[in-house]
Every structure is written in structure tokens, then in C-alpha cells.
Amino acid sequence: MSEQLPVAVATETKAERKKPKKKSWIKKLSPLFWVTVIIPTVISLVYFGFFASDRFTSQSSFVVRSPKSQSSLNGLGAILQGTGFARAQDDIYTVGEYMRSRSSLDELRKILPVREFYETKGDAFSRFNGFGFRGEEEAFYQYYKNQVMINFDTVSGISTLNVTSFDALESKKINEALLKQGEALINQLNDRARADTVRYAEEVVKTAAERVKEASQNLTDYRIANGVFDLKAQSEVQMGLVSKLQDELIVIQTQLDQVKAVTPENPQIPGLQAREQSLRKEIDQQLRAISGGGHSSLSNQAAEYQRVYLENQLAEQQLAAAMTSLESAKVEADRQQLYLEVISQPSLPDLAHEPKRLYNIVATLIIGLMVYGILSLLTASIREHKN
């Protein structure tokens, strides 16, 4: 028995050598799983865990409104309406689009080194032109638009402005500058609308004033040419003079009749008769001046004078109406003025809102597993089809 032991041990050792070694679980993973799940997840873990730069978002909110008639709203919108203002939704969209426009960016770059904010900070994947391939202005504008977001709440009428950059203070500065630009745009819209509203009324006033000047000059020229300054007053004066002459004529006739009756040969009779003839002549002249057929008679001048006078009066009334319309236009323009009210000032964030590191890593893992599952099913289906 002692001689057989070495043989048995040798046989057992040889059998153990023939057994295959167990593969580790890592080696059991298919290349497809490595490509779709492990490698992307590791890259995501390394990037978001160690290299991805923090990005800070400064937030502010504002509303554009005008003192128009109120409408029924709920919540904060009703509170804003209670102050006597109505929302100007069309204009708030205009302000929002302007804040993200090239014109706004050009104005912003005059006071802040915006491109430097986004080109010299942050990791290569996050900052603008991180690999030096696209440095055009159009490329920077498209990048910048993704850093400025505006959300509009149709219920309350409030817009929220979010500006993201790699530095909290820089985000706040850009946000503040954009709010000032929005306010400047509103003032520009107000000035233009007011000018358009008032311009027509001012032109009407100018035209009416020219008509008054022309009509007044025509009336003055007519008065000077015809010696008539107030036809009605002059007619009243002449009629009063005729009345006095007629009264005096009656007195003279009475005296003359009395003298003739008492003393027919009285020497006063010729004088009274001469005075009677003189009065009759004067009365006839005055009556002809008032209603005679001559061109200079008041009756003939009345129609022309009345026309010129009425033209002057009408022109003055039109001027007064135009002035009233101008004042009404100014009041209406003031009533339609727009106002940009800042609800909350730009914040100075002390916590980075982006990137969402854990979320991105987990999302990469889940997406990789989904892709792996789909590709595995496709591969198995193809193999089964071939078999």
C-alpha cells in the first residue's frame, strides 16, 4: 500500500490540472456590453465627477404692463391688475426676443467682456470654442443664446430671466444688464408710440393755425379796404344817427307848423324850412349808406363781410377743436405707456445649478443599458434568422 500512494497522488494532480479554470465576471462580459454600458458610464463618471465645470444661474423676474382697462386674472396676475395696470403680453414677448437677439448681445459687449466670460473659463466641453475649431461670431451668438433663457407665465404675466455662466457674479452682471436693456427698449417703444399718436394731431393743429392766420388776414384786409371794422356796430351807429335826425326833423316840422299857424310871415320860417330840408337830405344820405345800391353801402358790404367774418370764426373754432384733440391724443398716449417692473432682482447664486452630476452619470448608465438590450435583441434575432 505504501508503494501505491505516490502513484495515486500523481494521478490526482494530473486530473486537477486538466480541469478548466473559472473565468472572472469581468471577462464574461461581452464586448457589446463594454462598448454600450461600461465605457460610456466610466467616461461619464470621470468627466462629471472630476472635470465638468460648475455653472451658476442668476435668476430675475419682471413684468411689462400698461395702465389700460383691467381684465379678470387669478393669483399674482390679479394682484398686479389691482394696482391699476394691465398686462401687455405682445410687448413682453418683444422684450424677451430682444434680450436674446444679436442687437442685445452687441450692446452687452460694449459694457461687459461677455465672450471672455464664456471662452476663457470652464472645461473644454462646456466653454465656448473649447477645442479652437469654431471661433466665429455667429457660433458665439448661438452659444450665448443657450445661456440666456426667458420663461413667460401666461397666467400671472410674469417673465423669468435665467442667465448661466461659469461665475456667479458674472451671471448676475449679465442679468442686470439685460434688464436695463429691456427697460430701455420699453422706453424706446413708448417714445415711438407717443410720437406716432401725437404727430397727426400736431399736424392738424398746425394746419388749423395756418387757416386762422389766413382768415384773420383776409378779414383785416377787407376792413382796411372798405373802412369797415365792425359792420354790426357801424350799422347800429348809423341807424341811431338816422333815428336822431328823424326825431330832430319831427321837432322842426312841429315848430314850423306852429309858427305858420300863428304868424305866417314870421322871419323864422325860412330858417326852419332850410333846416328841414337839410335834415331830410342828411336822412336820405344815411339811409342810402345803409341800404342804398352803391358798392360802399352797408347792405351791399354785409354779405361779403359776413362771409369773411364767418371764415375767420370757423377757422378759430377748428383750431380750438384741433387743440382739444391734441390734448386728448397726449392723454391717450400717456395712458398707453408701457412699464417694465422688476418683480425680483437678479440673484447671486452661491450653489451651482449645473451640471447635475449624479443625474447625468445615472442617465448615461440607464441609456447604455437600454442600448445594450436593444442591440442584444437585434443580434440574437439576426443569429436566429441565420440558423
Curated annotation (Swiss-Prot):
Instruction: State the species of origin.
Output: Neisseria meningitidis serogroup B (strain ATCC BAA-335 / MC58)
Q: Which residues cross the membrane?
A: 32-52, 358-378
Tell me which family the UniProt entry assigns to this protein: Belongs to the BexC/CtrB/KpsE family.
Q: Does the keyword Transport apply?
A: yes
Task: Quote the protein name from its UniProt record.
Answer: Capsule polysaccharide export inner-membrane protein CtrB
How is the protein disposed in the membrane? Multi-pass membrane protein
NCBIfam families cross-referenced by the UniProt entry: BexC_CtrB_KpsE
Compartment(s) where it occurs, according to its Swiss-Prot or TrEMBL record: Cell inner membrane
Q: Which processes are annotated in GO (biological process)?
A: polysaccharide transport
PANTHER family listed in its UniProt record:
FERRIC ENTEROBACTIN TRANSPORT PROTEIN FEPE, TYROSINE-PROTEIN KINASE
**Which regions form coiled coils?**
none
Q: Which UniProt keywords apply?
A: Capsule biogenesis/degradation, Cell inner membrane, Cell membrane, Membrane, Polysaccharide transport, Sugar transport, Transmembrane, Transmembrane helix, Transport
Q: Which domain of life is it from?
A: Bacteria
